Amino acid sequence: MKNEDGKLKAMIFDIQSFSTHDGPGIRTNVFFKGCTLRCPWCANPESQKGNPQLLYTKMKCIGCMCCARACPYGAVSAITDPDEIKRVGYVHHDRSKCDKCTTHECLSACFQEALSIAGELMTVDDVMKKIDRDAVVYRNKGGVTVSGGDPLLHPDFLEELLCRCHEKAYNVALESELCVPTKNLERVMPYIDYYYTDCKIIDPVEHKRITGVSNDIILKNLRLIGERCPERMVLRTPIIPGFTDSDENIDGIASFAAECHFPTMNILPYHKLGVTKHERLGSTYQLPNVQPPSDAQMHHLADIIEAHGVKCIIN
């Protein structure tokens, strides 16, 4: 996407400084909006859609209705039932109207700061200004991580951004689902120092049933990385009881990792950090009754992986 000046723009929902995740050292993480998968356990649901989205924090809301009076579209209504207030807060937002809004007048009207927007169109210059201000912390193996959503859904913007990072010798980590055309990946491979990709479910039919899409293109792109630079890949599998945690699935993923010569797999135990984010988006969390796997189960799955000669790290 380009603005009136012909500058590339992308929808960014967060830029985190001083991060110690998804790459070595201290990093600046840039989070892009838009994802092709719809994993029911998603911890960042605000990353899925490509448009700005309203976030409502019910604990900050006092029910003053200033937001309703400011909204020109009538998207905000009061909740009066005490039980409903306890569950979702003082106000209801018609998300079909909120998603189309471009003025967000409710934000400036809310002095309690109960409202915010996930998603802002930014130019490459905008993002680089935020990256450059952290440059001093990149000296000790730190760098820039592009994440999402999926940054590879913004290939023109991403290529320019990573080229700029490369010119300044910032090391770059890419966190991507790789569910994108292979040409999108190939365009940025010269600038990537580390890859972090989930391989959630090895069976393509089951993958489509759970996430909404087949994993054919994901596996194709992983094989490409395996052919060119396998040592740069950290393959990850979230361990979601009832979805990804079967011995058969983990064995299949580990076999694939070994085939691609990926040296390391990370397995990540299920958590419920996404529940609050779903509440703020006004969406329903799909796995309220799923519990994290036991330590014994995690170590059992790690043993299956390491039997294939792939180092396993439990995160």
Curated annotation (Swiss-Prot):
One of its GO terms (molecular function) is oxidoreductase activity. Residues 52-81, 89-120 form the 4Fe-4S ferredoxin-type domain. S-adenosyl-L-methionine binds at residues 149, 198-200, 271. Its cofactor is [4Fe-4S] cluster. InterPro entries: 4Fe4S_Fe-S-bd, 4Fe4S_Fe_S_CS, Aldolase_TIM, BssD/PflA/YjjW, Ind_deCO2_activ, Organic_radical-activating, Organic_radical_activase, Radical_activat_CS. Residues 21-311 form the Radical SAM core domain. It is an enzyme of class 1 (oxidoreductase). PROSITE patterns: 4FE4S_FER_1, 4FE4S_FER_2, RADICAL_ACTIVATING, RADICAL_SAM. [4Fe-4S] cluster 2 binds at residues 61, 64, 67, 110. Its EC number is 1.97.1.-. [4Fe-4S] cluster 1 binds at residues 35, 39, 42. It catalyses: glycyl-[protein] + reduced [flavodoxin] + S-adenosyl-L-methionine = glycin-2-yl radical-[protein] + semiquinone [flavodoxin] + 5'-deoxyadenosine + L-methionine + H(+). Keywords: 4Fe-4S, Iron, Iron-sulfur, Metal-binding, Oxidoreductase, S-adenosyl-L-methionine. The keyword S-adenosyl-L-methionine applies. [4Fe-4S] cluster 3 binds at residues 71, 98, 101, 106. Binds 3 [4Fe-4S] clusters. One cluster is coordinated with 3 cysteines and an exchangeable S-adenosyl-L-methionine. Catalyzes activation of the indoleacetate decarboxylase OsIAD under anaerobic conditions by generation of an organic free radical on a glycine residue, via a homolytic cleavage of S-adenosyl-L-methionine (SAM). Belongs to the organic radical-activating enzymes family. NCBIfam families: ind_deCO2_activ (NF033719), PFLE_PFLC (TIGR02494). This is Indoleacetate decarboxylase activating enzyme.
